[in-house]
Regions:
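Non-catalytic, mobile gating and regulatory segments of ester bond hydrolases
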Residues: 1-228
Length: 228
């Protein structure tokens, strides 16, 4: 998805996908299933991208990781992003504790995939692709299940939230993102669609992203590290 965004977004936005171990070109690597370890790994691997004129974007688990990266940068005295854009996620302090309960077998994961939508039917018909997807999803869910907010302080960063009206995430959990920033530049954009509104209404999402970024980022060489 983010590779396509490179073609669709204005040239002043450079999209830098942060690929996670066990996925894509890193398929041969072991999954990292601990949230703090994943954040630490990404901060180290992308030290150059996480400098200067950059913003962070993430969808679903990626939103949580983007927030975690911003928190880690703050804690270590490194430059903060000019903006944090999060999509399809409850606020870190208001995550549903039961969301990933009993998601430890293939049947439950497949049912959840069908419920969330956004997965091509062809994938379910391919044992190899389905196995790969289930393993990745299970690893993602273990990362999310092990996450703990620990009373992290709000960030002094503009924060922009994208959400789907038909997503299972309760609106108040999404709106709680407003407590994660001390900056006056908070916004919440709602889109039609469920958890994968980001794909269903890609043009509208990208238009909102471009609209929000200039409010927080200035210049002609802006980097957008992105995590799906």
């Amino acid at each position: 998805m983010y590779l396509r965004w490179r073609r669709l977004l204005p040239r002043w936005i450079e999209v830098v996908p942060l690929e996670l171990p066990g996925r894509g070109s890193r398929l041969g690597e072991d999954f990292v299933e601990d949230f703090d370890a994943m954040v630490s790994l990404l901060c180290g691997e992308h030290e150059v991208a996480l400098r200067g004129n950059f913003a962070l974007f993430g969808h679903s688990m990626g939103a949580l990781l983007a927030w975690g990266i911003a928190q880690r940068l703050c804690a270590t005295g490194r430059p903060l992003p000019r903006a944090l854009l999060v999509s399809g996620s409850a606020a870190p302090s208001q995550r549903d504790p039961d969301r990933f309960v009993d998601m430890d077998d293939d049947e439950a994961l497949i049912a959840d995939m069908r419920k969330q939508g956004g997965t091509p039917e062809e994938l379910f018909a391919s044992p190899e692709l389905l196995r790969m997807t289930l393993d990745t999803l299970a690893a993602d869910y273990r990362v999310c299940e092990g996450f703990a907010h620990r009373g992290a302080a709000p960030l002094s960063v503009p924060l922009h939230v994208f959400a789907g009206r038909e997503d299972d995430i309760q609106p108040w959990r999404v709106e709680a993102w407003s407590a994660e920033t001390l900056d006056a530049g908070f916004s919440l954009d709602w889109f039609e669609g469920g958890h994968f509104f980001i794909r269903q209404h890609e043009a509208q999402v990208l238009a909102a992203l471009v609209r929000r970024l200039p409010q927080s980022v200035a210049g002609e060489a802006d980097v957008l590290p992105a995590i799906a």
